[in-house]
Amino acid sequence: LKCHQLVPPFWKTCPEGKNLCYKMYMVSSSTVPVKRGCIDVCPKNSALVKYVCCNTDKCN
């Protein structure tokens, strides 16, 4: 699995066990991702932060 890093088109190959790509947004500015990468479990959204997770190559 390969996930984008903070600035596409750059990406990295995910380590073993981290099988999801994710994007993290601040709820206040939901158009600009704050963080991207590989993760093992999709975090829950909170009042301030929203996560978008997916399990295909470079989908974040």
Curated annotation (Swiss-Prot):
Keywords associated with the record: Cardiotoxin, Cytolysis, Disulfide bond, Membrane, Secreted, Target cell membrane, Target membrane, Toxin
The UniProt record lists the keyword Disulfide bond: yes
Major location (coarse): secreted
Annotated GO MF terms: toxin activity
Location of the protein in the cell: Secreted; Target cell membrane
InterPro entries: Cytotoxin_Cobra, Snake_3FTx, Snake_toxin-like_sf, Snake_toxin_con_site, Toxin_cobra-type
Pfam families: Toxin_cobra-type
One Gene Ontology biological process: killing of cells of another organism
Disulfide bonds: C3-C21, C14-C38, C42-C53, C54-C59
Tissue specificity of this protein: Expressed by the venom gland.
GO CC terms: extracellular region; membrane; other organism cell membrane
Secreted as UniProt keyword: yes
Subunit structure: Monomer in solution; Homodimer and oligomer in the presence of negatively charged lipids forming a pore with a size ranging between 20 and 30 Angstroms.
Family recorded in the similarity comment: Belongs to the three-finger toxin family. Short-chain subfamily. Type IA cytotoxin sub-subfamily.
More details: Is classified as a S-type cytotoxin, since a serine residue stands at position 27 (Ser-29 in standard classification).
Function: Shows cytolytic activity on many different cells by forming pore in lipid membranes. In vivo, increases heart rate or kills the animal by cardiac arrest. In addition, it binds to heparin with high affinity, interacts with Kv channel-interacting protein 1 (KCNIP1) in a calcium-independent manner, and binds to integrin alpha-V/beta-3 (ITGAV/ITGB3) with moderate affinity.
Protein name: Cytotoxin 5
Organism this protein belongs to: Naja haje haje
